[in-house]
Each structure stands twice: as structure tokens, then as C-alpha cells.
């Protein structure tokens, strides 16, 4: 009887230690703070990478960051796989929200912007962000809530 209680208690401890640690993530995904993450080495443009992420799991998207700790966690997963490569993150079309004006204060009436949209990459070693044409291809990281 004592051995049964000991084994039952041990199983309960194991179960409780796994719950809330991302145990709900699929086996090929990594967990951090109730989210699941996966690095994909295949290079895609930003739009195709986002579509691919959405196909992987319900509510999955290109990775977003809520803190530097989360970004560091993602870097710890991307760097061993990709070394110094850039990866797509879920930030895109940031310039659409900017209100630009000339340095002399006059309104922007004429522009010669490239038709290329700009999206954001993150450097896998140090989390520095860079704008790149959304049509370029890079590896990417997907994220969903566990």
C-alpha cells in the first residue's frame, strides 16, 4: 500500500510539473510562457511564411515579441539552427502608420516610394531588427498560444 501511494504521488508530481510548462506544444515545437514556437529553415517571402504559419496550427502566426526575454528565448532557438541568419518575424507594413512631413514642416504632397512593401527580420544572434523587402526570402519562426 505504501509503495502504491509513493508511485501515485510521484506520478502526480510529474504531471503537475509538466502542466503549465508548455506540455501542450507538439513535440517538434518549443514552449515559453504559455506559447509554442518553431523555427523553419525553409526560406519563404514574408506573406508565404505567414500563410505557412497559419497552416501549422490554429492561431499560429509569424512570431511576435512581448518582451526582450521572449526575444532572447527565440534567439536561443534560432541561432543553433541558423547561425547568423535573419528570420522573418510577424512585424510588417510598419511604414503605413507613419505620418511623414518634410524637415521644414511642409506636408508630403509628392513621393517616390518604391512599390515594395517593407517587412521586419530579426537577426538570430542578437535580436536586432532590420527592414527588408517583403518579397525577399528568409527562414522564419512561427508562434501560437498553447
UniProtKB/Swiss-Prot annotation:
SS bond partners: 25-36, 53-142, 119-134
A Gene Ontology molecular function term of the record: toxin activity
The keyword Transmembrane helix is assigned to this record: no
Any one GO cellular component localisation term in the record: extracellular region
UniProt note on tissues of expression: Expressed by the venom gland.
Record-stated family: Belongs to the snaclec family.
Primary localization class, coarse: secreted
Keyword Chloroplast tagged: no
Oligomer and partners: Heteromultimer; disulfide-linked.
Subcellular location(s) of the protein: Secreted
Residue ranges of every copy of the C-type lectin domain listed in the record: 32-143
Record keywords, A-Z: Disulfide bond, Hemostasis impairing toxin, Secreted, Signal, Toxin
Domain of life: Eukaryota
Pfam families in UniProt: Lectin_C
Function comment: Interferes with one step of hemostasis (modulation of platelet aggregation, or coagulation cascade, for example).
Position of the signal peptide: 1-23
Protein name: Snaclec stejaggregin-B subunit beta-1
InterPro entries: C-type_lectin-like, C-type_lectin-like/link_sf, C-type_lectin/snaclec_domain, CTDL_fold
Amino acid at each position: 500500500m505504501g509503495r502504491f501511494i509513493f508511485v501515485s504521488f510521484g506520478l502526480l508530481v510529474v504531471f503537475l510539473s509538466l502542466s503549465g510548462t508548455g506540455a501542450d506544444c507538439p513535440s517538434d515545437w518549443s514552449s515559453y510562457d504559455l506559447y509554442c514556437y518553431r523555427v523553419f529553415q525553409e526560406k519563404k517571402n514574408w506573406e508565404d511564411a505567414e500563410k505557412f504559419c497559419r497552416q501549422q496550427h490554429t492561431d499560429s502566426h509569424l512570431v511576435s515579441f512581448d518582451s526582450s526575454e521572449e526575444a532572447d528565448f527565440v534567439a536561443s532557438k534560432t541561432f543553433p539552427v541558423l547561425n547568423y541568419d535573419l528570420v522573418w518575424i510577424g512585424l510588417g507594413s510598419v511604414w503605413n502608420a507613419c505620418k511623414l512631413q518634410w524637415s521644414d514642416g511642409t506636408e508630403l504632397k509628392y513621393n517616390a516610394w518604391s512599390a515594395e512593401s517593407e517587412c521586419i527580420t530579426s537577426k538570430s544572434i542578437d535580436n536586432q531588427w532590420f527592414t527588408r523587402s517583403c518579397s525577399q526570402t528568409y527562414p522564419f519562426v512561427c508562434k501560437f498560444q498553447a
